Amino acid sequence: MAAQLLEEDVVTCSICLGRYRDPVTLPCGHSFCGNCIQDSWRSCEKSCPECRQPFPEGAKLSRNVKMSTLLQALPVLPAPPAVTPRRDSATSHSARCLRHGRPLEFFCRTEGLCVCSACTVHDCSHHERALLDVERRVREDQLRARVLVTQQQVAQAETQLQELQEQRSRIESSACTLASVVSRRFSSLLQALEKQQASTLSDIEVAKKQALGQVLNEKQRLTDHLRALSQYDQSVQDLLAQADDCIFFQELQQLPEPTESLGPLTSPQWNEEQQLSNVNQLLSPLCELLLEEKSLPKVAAKAADAGPLETLGPLAPVPSAVCPLRKKLWQNYRNLTFDPETANQYLHLSHKDQRVTHHFQAQGPAKSGSFELWQVQCTQSFQTGQHYWEVRVSDHSVTLGVTYPKLSRQKLGTHTDNIGRGPCSWGLCIQEDSMQAWHNGKSQRLRGLPGQLLGVDLNLTSGCLTFYSLEPRTQPLHTFYAVFSQPLFPVFWLLEGRTLTLCHQPEATLPARPQEEATAPS
């Protein structure tokens, strides 16, 4: 048996680990299969796989005649039975190095390959090496550690996934509850608002019926008085037509006394301004809360009596590019002109009635419809829809506003202008160091100072009048909320030496006169 194993070792190629096929011998004396050595040299330098001795350049492989004869004399071995690979050191060490034909006993950590003892001497002498079974245990420990970390990550991910599911359930439940609460709250507010609307309309209807009842009573009284006068007149005419003197005197004594004069009529108790005041007191806070643009910076103060304000000054400079808000306002731009019949005698109109200048000397006698104060009104007026216009002022000490047609032309009290001093006008008064919003004789002091380019947005649909400062950026200054019941005219006041210009846009148009424009008052 030992002899047979020895013979097999002698006739075995160290490259393919099988019996020699067409054995050849190298100059160093080692033998290999002819095809095996040729294949080995295609992938590496020409040297002996056993001893690494270089193969001389130009030399030829010599056929090993004795080995060929010996192979022919040996019996053919049966094919080895198929075995199941085992992960033990003996099986691992049965593999051989392709370069040296020796068993693979080491692991080169530098190259990441299994090597033989010859490789450790010739090729991996300076590399980090370890025995296969030792390296195997190290790598298995590393894999087990990785598996442990992975399992921990899996457990953590599953826990986090469960938490996310719980958070999702809580969010859905909370959102559903919140939506239900908000829906109920808004429903109650809508019901309260509808109830208040019905109550307000009912009050207006009651006041209307009372006023109409008074009118009907006065009408009936006048009708009865006219009938009595007519009857007396007819009796007198019949008496005058009587030819018989005795009958004349007899009927004259029976003629009743003439009906006494009724005197002045009783005016019906109907005050439109009072009704509007009551409605505005109710709706203005709601409109300010619900209709105001929350995304825009708010400059106006809430109340005039809030105590001393911070130091006032011009707005911080920023780029003057046209912002989306101003472009949106331009969709309702209106080109306005001043009405010369309303201009104070110290105000001079020019540039096709688009510019007004306050001179120190009168420009002529006062007209019948002109303001006694330094004011001028526009020709155009608006009753429905949304409208926007822009004004450039030479300096502060001006007032911008809108008014009903019946704004008084005379001076009222000690004020320099009457814009916003009564219930029929609304105004923004811009002084050198302050700014106030005026309506019905009440003012709100506002923070900051605007630039010289101003905008006015009149939304009659929603009942909003908003003033804007356009330089150095577009921002709202103040918004009035009211129920406008009559046509509104733009109106202005300016101090001596000031100039005010109505800016025109070439593409701007005015609405149709029957729907949205009223004629100027005489």
Curated annotation (Swiss-Prot):
It comes from Mus musculus. This is E3 ubiquitin-protein ligase TRIM65. Belongs to the TRIM/RBCC family. Pathway: Protein modification; protein ubiquitination. It catalyses: S-ubiquitinyl-[E2 ubiquitin-conjugating enzyme]-L-cysteine + [acceptor protein]-L-lysine = [E2 ubiquitin-conjugating enzyme]-L-cysteine + N(6)-ubiquitinyl-[acceptor protein]-L-lysine. It is an enzyme of class 2 (transferase). A zinc finger (RING-type) spans 13-52. Keywords: Acetylation, Coiled coil, Cytoplasm, Immunity, Innate immunity, Metal-binding, Phosphoprotein, Transferase, Zinc, Zinc-finger.
